[in-house]
């Protein structure tokens, strides 16, 4: 109803997620420049297994993770399950006519989820005329994802796990939903925090979500965020 609520507090702790926190802090500091939102570019792949994979879980966790020595990418592999096939149909309704076929063959499907390091981030946020624009720019990142997917395919095929059939889907920049790194530790700009996660020049404001981290190599960083929140909680 366009109403403002004003309250006074000695300390304010933000743990509302990178996008929401970044919007609030940008607005608070009146920052108008473009801010890069770091994330892990993603590629989905599905392979056809030579043998059916039997399991009893409705949702099968990752059975195998493959990481490059340099940390440039990692991939997790898991068998198909009803939750995955239903999610595919929800996201891409044009697969509805073959829903029965997808569910019938899902025990021969191996799904791969490839994530790149944060150097390939391509999501930005900027405040323009009191509104926030979130956007991406033209990039050739899909070429890198396809290249690494070929490595996964060769590994599975050479070990006689799959047939030479696969399908890939690049959902676009930001579709990984691993957003972080907008308000990093010890940056020179106003958008930064100290070792106690206090906002620069505003030490009554604490930020404890993914905004403060650069998870360049760690593609599954939830544990780090939780551990840091507990650390800051003890300091308070």
Explain the meaning of each model-derived region:
Residues 22-24, 123, 194, 215-217:
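Short helix/loop capping segments that flank catalytic or ligand/cofactor-binding pockets
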Residues 147-216, 222:
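A glycine-rich dinucleotide-binding beta-alpha-beta segment and adjacent secondary-structure elements
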Residues 8-10, 202-203:
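Short, well-ordered alpha-helix to beta-strand connector turns
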Residues 3, 10-118:
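Mid-to-C-terminal "cap/lid" subdomains and adjacent gly/pro-rich loops that border
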Residues 153, 223-236:
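An active-site-proximal "capping" alpha-helix that borders the catalytic cofactor pocket
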Residues 93-163:
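C-terminal catalytic lobe of FAD-dependent flavoproteins
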Residues 58, 149, 234-235:
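N-terminal export/assembly segments and adjacent metallocofactor-ligating motifs
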Residues 15, 142-143, 216-223, 227:
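Short, conserved micro-motifs enriched in small and acidic residues
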């Amino acid at each position: 109803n366009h109403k403002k609520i004003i309250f006074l507090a000695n300390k304010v702790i933000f743990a509302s997620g990178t996008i929401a926190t970044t919007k609030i802090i940008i607005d608070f500091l009146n920052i108008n420049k473009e801010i890069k939102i770091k994330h892990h570019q993603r590629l989905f792949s599905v392979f056809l297994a030579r043998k059916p994979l039997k399991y009893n879980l409705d949702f099968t966790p990752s059975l195998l993770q493959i990481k490059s020595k340099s940390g440039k990418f990692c991939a997790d592999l898991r068998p198909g399950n009803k939750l995955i096939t239903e999610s595919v149909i929800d996201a891409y309704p044009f697969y509805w006519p073959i829903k029965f076929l997808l569910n019938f063959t899902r025990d021969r499907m191996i799904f791969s989820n490839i994530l790149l390091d944060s150097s390939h981030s391509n999501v930005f946020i900027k405040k323009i005329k009191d509104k926030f624009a979130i956007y991406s720019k033209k990039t050739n990142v899909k070429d890198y994802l396809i290249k690494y997917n070929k490595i996964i395919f060769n590994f599975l095929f050479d070990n006689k796990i799959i047939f030479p059939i696969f399908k890939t889907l690049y959902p676009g920049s930001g579709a990984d939903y691993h957003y972080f790194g907008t308000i990093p530790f010890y940056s020179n700009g106003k958008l930064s925090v100290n070792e106690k996660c206090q906002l620069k020049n505003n030490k009554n404001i604490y930020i404890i979500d993914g905004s403060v981290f650069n998870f360049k190599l760690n593609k599954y960083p939830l544990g780090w965020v939780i551990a840091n929140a507990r650390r800051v909680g003890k300091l308070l």
